[in-house]
Structure formats: C-alpha cells, structure tokens
Amino acid sequence: MLALSRKLNESIMLGNDIEITILEIKGDQVKIGIKAPKSVPIYRKEIYLQIQESNKEAIDGGVSLEAISKLF
C-alpha cells in the first residue's frame, strides 16, 4: 500500500482523470473530494462490501432457472 501525506486543499492524482482532494480536516475526520469520470463507480468501503455481499447472496440464493422461467 502506498501511503501519502497531504495537507488541506492538496490533491492526489490517480491515473490521468481521477483527482482526490483534501477538503476539510476536523479532529479525527478528513473530508475528501473526488473528481472522476461518471463511468467510474465510487463507493465508501462499507457500502461496497454490502453490495458484494448482496451479489453473493443473490448468486447463492438457490433460485433456479426453472423458477425464473415460470415468471414469464
């Protein structure tokens, strides 16, 4: 993992088109801004993990193709 130090209003570039800027620092919280193309999904990690778990449950849900075909 690369660890970088940034001060208020300083940025980090990821590739050519993603910019992460430090917007605010209050106590132990840091507010960041992210400029990225709309095609790049951006999630907080806890939300990303929930999405992954939901996708896994959907796959493992035991719904058969036969049951799905009966819906149509």
Curated annotation (Swiss-Prot):
Pfam families: CsrA (PF02599)
Example of a GO MF term: mRNA 5'-UTR binding
Keyword Aminoacyl-tRNA synthetase included in the entry's annotation: no
GO biological process, one term: bacterial-type flagellum organization
Coiled-coil annotated spans: none
InterPro entries: CsrA, CsrA_sf
One term under GO cellular component: cytosol
Keywords: Bacterial flagellum biogenesis, Cytoplasm, Repressor, RNA-binding, Translation regulation
Annotated localization: Cytoplasm
Recorded superkingdom: Bacteria
Role of this protein: A translational regulator that binds mRNA to regulate translation initiation and/or mRNA stability. Usually binds in the 5'-UTR at or near the Shine-Dalgarno sequence preventing ribosome-binding, thus repressing translation. Its main target seems to be the major flagellin gene, while its function is anatagonized by FliW.
NCBIfam families named in the record: csrA (TIGR00202), PRK01712.1 (NF002469)
Subunit structure of this chain's protein: Homodimer; the beta-strands of each monomer intercalate to form a hydrophobic core, while the alpha-helices form wings that extend away from the core.
UniProt record similarity statement: Belongs to the CsrA/RsmA family.
Alphabetized PANTHER family for the sequence: CARBON STORAGE REGULATOR
Protein name (record): Translational regulator CsrA
Lineage: Bacteria, Bacillati, Bacillota, Clostridia, Lachnospirales
